[in-house]
Amino acid sequence: MNQEITNNPFNPLTPPKVFDEIKVSLASPERILSWSYGEIKKPETINYRTFKPERDGLFCARIFGPIKDYECLCGKYKRMKYRGVVCEKCGVEVTLQKVRRERMGHIELAAPVAHIWFLKSLPSRIGLMLDMTLRDLERVLYFENYVVIEPGLTDLQYGQMMTEEEYMDAQDAYGMDAFTANIGAEAIREMLAAIDLEAEAEHLRAELAEATGELKPKKIIKRLKVVESFLESGNRPEWMIMTVIPVIPPELRPLVPLDGGRFATSDLNDLYRRVINRNNRLKRLIELRAPDIIVRNEKRMLQESVDALFDNGRRGRVITGANKRPLKSLSDMLKGKQGRFRQNLLGKRVDFSGRSVIVTGPELKLHQCGLPKKMALELFKPFIYSRLEAKGLSSTVKQAKKLVEKERPEVWDILDEVIREHPVMLNRAPTLHRLGIQAFEPTLIEGKAIQLHPLVCSAFNADFDGDQMAVHVPLSLEAQLEARVLMMSTNNVLSPANGAPIIVPSQDMILGLYYLTLEREGMKGEGKIFGNLDEVQHALDAGEVHLHSKVTVRVPQIDEEGNEVFQRFETTPGRARLGSLLPKNAKAPFELVNRLLRKREVQQVIDTVYRYCGQKESVIFCDQIMTMGFREAFKAGISFGKDDMVIPDNKWTIVDDTRDQVKDFEQQYMDGLITQGEKYNKVVDAWSKCNDKLTEAMMSTISAVKKAEDGSDMEPNSVYMMAHSGARGSVTQMRQLGGMRGLMAKPNGDIIETPVISNFKEGLTVLEYFNSTHGARKGLSDTALKTANSGYLTRRLVDVAQDCIVREHDCGTERAITAETAVNDGEVVASLGERILGRVAADDVKRPGTEEVLLAAGQLIDERMADTIEEAGVQSMRIRSPLTCESEEGVCAMCYGRDLARGTMVNSGEAVGIIAAQSIGEPGTQLTMRTFHIGGVAQGGQQSFLEASQEGKIVFENTNTLTNANGEVLTIGRNMKLIIQDEHGEERSSHKLGYGTKLFVKEGQEVKRGDKLFEWDPYTLPIIAEKPGTAKYVDLVSGLAVREETDDATGMTQKIVIDWRAAPKGSDLKPEIILVGDDGEPVRNSLGNPLTYPMSVDAILSCEDGQKIEAGDVVARIPREGAKTKDITGGLPRVAELFEARRPKDHAIIAEIDGYVRFGRDYKNKRRISIEPADESMEAVEYMVPKGKHIPVVEGDFVQKGDYIMDGNPAPHDILSIMGVEALANYMIDEVQDVYRLQGVKINDKHIEVIVRQMLQKWEISDSGETTLLKGEHVDKQEFDAANEKALARGKRPAQGEPILLGITKASLQTRSFISAASFQETTRVLTEASVQGKKDKLVGLKENVIVGRLIPAGTGGATQQVRHIAASRDNVVLEARREEAEAAAALAAPMADDAADADFLVETPESRD
């Protein structure tokens, strides 16, 4: 009886098995037999009349255990008292039925069979071990070819393939016993068994040392890796060929009788039956000594059936069941969304949960939710039962159940008690970030819908149009505590993505607050003075003063010392009312609300209150302004009718002007002054400018203050109020209602030239309506795709970052990154203050121009600090970053900085990787799916000039200009910069000047804000003559390299360079224009090189052959469509492309060294560019560029490391290898942020840094030295360092390597944890690899731990782990002390026997009574 208690799974007395790591390896036949409880000999399952399992069949009770608890099959022994007895009649052990879930069987195969995973999973492990190709292997295994195993003295080769005839001939030629050749899996098994791994490894290493060429070393390295992994893991190669097959327990492949005498069965039973049938038939054939050919066929069929069992459809035909559906094999059980990993281990259904529709609950407090009584009764049943018993209202659970079912009144009282202070968790699918699950205290409500507090809607992304939410009940005390302390909605005021409050009013509340804080001239009661806030309220109630009138009010304020003082404010009664809600704090003065509050301002107010007044105050404040917002919006009664949409009076004049402009462009095109593409660009531009003008006119009309008869201001237009306050609608939508709809896009992203001129108020014409449907439909189909894509991106990000946890406080690294203001096209997009907020300073920051230290290294920068640094005018500073953190696992708190959701230093154990992944993935659905071509013209025209954003002095860098005949200054350098400096000579802004830019300012000139600095042609890239001379065409052969295009519309001809390589005769042409002087010699530049202008495809020639040219004249123009303004891959695809680290199609070429450009010999249709290093000791570097691509450098140009030699998007790998980790990080951060900024989404840089850190974990070995690492292998930095330390300790040469950038999918599949990788993608491949290498999973990440069913090592789970470690170490100390004491006692006891008795009490310490 006693033993029984310990075996009961629900009994806590038995300690669960504790383990630290999981190892997976190949199973040897002996291992398989040791698991097995018996061999399965028959394919039968159960007897269909008695429903009893057949003996020796797939469900045999003798092997797997009894069908009923404690009862043998024939019924001879029943009940507990016989437990452990084996019945002599039916051979069944009397025990729990549960053992049928854990006992395995086996099948002895009559012939060995290859395991398909090791055969077909690429690269084929068996093939690599034997150095055979997969085709040859399959021929041997499926009995088509013989293979020579022992050549003997014949001239055959080991491993040589022979057909049946060749085998016969060889036997005739050499005699039967002269050599051994075999066929089938036996042959392969013999060959594998014969391999001596150590000798093989030695041999391969020796070969590798000698191997030359490209492919050979690669192949040897691959084989060497496999051999090494077998050596290290202790696996034997012949175990990849199976002689015994394990059979999984019957309860895991159940057979369920349906009504009507039929059975539902798992597909595995069918697959096993095929194997057993064929195996038995094969045994019989071998016994009967059947002809070879029949036996062989049977063996092949056996091989195929085992293949199907392990991985159906991997090879040959898919085996289907009776219903033509492919059978689910063992591999399919693990794979995919429905597989074991993702369906059962990572995502489970939970008890004590329910779901219902949500409705709004405006009278709830922020920490409450309304729970329907019916749901609560069901969810809290166990608590109610126990409470009923405790109160003595029921004596048994059955009685309690009856009471609850009848819904007696006392049950409701008890439910109230139970629910008090017991938080529940609410979840809205899709849970895109951690705020998708929050805890609330339930209040019971009638009805059937859950009530949700309006302020948390934005966190859940919920609305009340029929959304459903799920409720979960945390049961244990610990779970309730965590829900209350960590997940309560009041603890999640700030968003983890950017640290801004996420509990902000929206829609109605914003409209109410906006209306409340309006100020209007001439309202009733203007100029009155009130002594305190109560007086204001009385006057409002009495109707003596209007909400919006200008009055003076005395408001109590807190000064710096914390004393209450009265201050007078010019304000309105509405603002005074709002001010009365503010917490009393010096940092939250009345000025905070004494202004017109729009959405941004409200968020700012909440942020300030949260930062300075603490959490409790701010939560109360949020609740109060929500109530006030709703009430005021309701009292204001703002609504809108058709007349609220105002059409500006001058609409048609603006439209007609634009029409005239467009006519001009058409005419210019007819006259051949501009190309079709340029015309299109200009027309689109003109219309978007027209749209902007119209919008401005409309906004100024609609926002203008109108006066009533009595001279008081009228209420603002209600549509304007809604849009302006940020409650609903936007300027774009108002423009469509009252201006013009504007330009429409085709589904492929192109913009239709003819805009929709009508607005919705006037109504669209049929044609306009048709144009509109085009893009609208695309928008809808986009949305559906977007959700799936965004979800997949999040999943990949989570997978790559899941094991990034804060593991220590400080890693003590010296490294850091530089933070500076982010500037995009000369406009500041993120100030330095924003970027350094919540980071730790790496070096002391000094006030510019002085030695005063503003903040010391190692300090966390808070809001005040950031402001101080901004005001001091610091340009850049060094900050700690997760990228440079040197922690072994995860990151350290100092490198990470502030936990954005709490506003304090990040805690140890915070899962920052997952937070980063969620922050980047969650806004994914808001991003667009589209790829914009011509850089987003719909967003308003191409910028073609730049104005000074600051005032200061102009300084040029790398000046290279010339003045043309009209006296205009043009830049002809490639890397010229224009810098604006302040009076201290500090750089305020810098702009790169493109080739052909026209300058309006001179060196040293003082500029004011808004002065025009320079302009350029946004649509074409000019090629400018540097010296005067005569143009001479070279190789510009008409018809081959140039086509004369006569425009049908204009009758004008233009010369356009075409792709000369396409023509058969044109392959060796080099089309260019050279300048010759009067003497017929080419004009040379300052370096003495002749001035030649190579032409690229699509260039338009602007000069005739033999034409006189002045310096600064345009020789040719390249349309920007040819020299693309980078194809802007917008939105989600761009983010995915960046994180997957894909090489862009025409990626830019980056100079690897400083040096001078030389053009080398051309090769086929590539141009050879080499850089001669300025530093003599370095090698020259060569690049091949496709001909006809525009190359922005010319012969003899000096380029610096990191300059672009060919335009385009750079490949992130190049940035890493040439310019280092920090440059890569900056590139990634800027590019990702650009995409999100376009949608107005704020994400903190550190999240992107965390992901980039995870992408940079691996090192690629460039030279293996004398270590065990192999060239080209990807290893973790730690493994790399460890291997090198080992080598150095032995005095050997260390390996060389460099960090390598992996895309997130690759990085996830290459994590150290094979369990995590297998649950992500390509399950079979990962597991095959892991088992061959005998990989160990140390269970450090979150995913592995969830899968094996323990607490995750982050958050409270991490704390539990630490406590366990401490306890274990203390136990060790105690045990150690006890051992020493025992030894001392033994030493004392040795000389005098009588003292031994006294020595015993020494050992008796309190700890030893465990």
UniProtKB/Swiss-Prot annotation:
Chain positions recorded as Mg(2+) binding sites: D463, D465, D467
Cofactor: Mg(2+); Zn(2+)
Enzyme nomenclature, EC number: 2.7.7.6
Record SMART domains: RPOLA_N
Cross-referenced InterPro entries: DNA-dir_RpoC_beta_prime (IPR045867), DNA-dir_RpoC_beta_prime_bact (IPR012754), RNA_pol_asu (IPR000722), RNA_pol_N (IPR006592), RNA_pol_Rpb1_1 (IPR007080), RNA_pol_Rpb1_3 (IPR007066), RNA_pol_Rpb1_3_sf (IPR042102), RNA_pol_Rpb1_4 (IPR007083)
Catalytic class of the enzyme: transferase
GO molecular function, one term: magnesium ion binding
GO CC aspect terms: DNA-directed RNA polymerase complex
Positions contributing to Zn(2+) 2 binding: C811, C885, C892, C895
Keywords associated with the record: DNA-directed RNA polymerase, Magnesium, Metal-binding, Nucleotidyltransferase, Transcription, Transferase, Zinc
Binding residue positions for Zn(2+) 1: C72, C74, C87, C90
Keyword rRNA-binding: no
Cofactor note: Binds 1 Mg(2+) ion per subunit.
Record carries keyword Transferase: yes
GO biological process: DNA-templated transcription
SUPFAM superfamilies: beta and beta-prime subunits of DNA dependent RNA-polymerase
Entry similarity comment: Belongs to the RNA polymerase beta' chain family.
Physiological role: DNA-dependent RNA polymerase catalyzes the transcription of DNA into RNA using the four ribonucleoside triphosphates as substrates.
Complex formation: The RNAP catalytic core consists of 2 alpha, 1 beta, 1 beta' and 1 omega subunit. When a sigma factor is associated with the core the holoenzyme is formed, which can initiate transcription.
NCBIfam families: rpoC_TIGR
Annotated protein name in UniProt: DNA-directed RNA polymerase subunit beta'
Organism in which the protein naturally occurs: Ruegeria sp. (strain TM1040)
Taxonomic placement: Bacteria, Pseudomonadati, Pseudomonadota, Alphaproteobacteria, Rhodobacterales
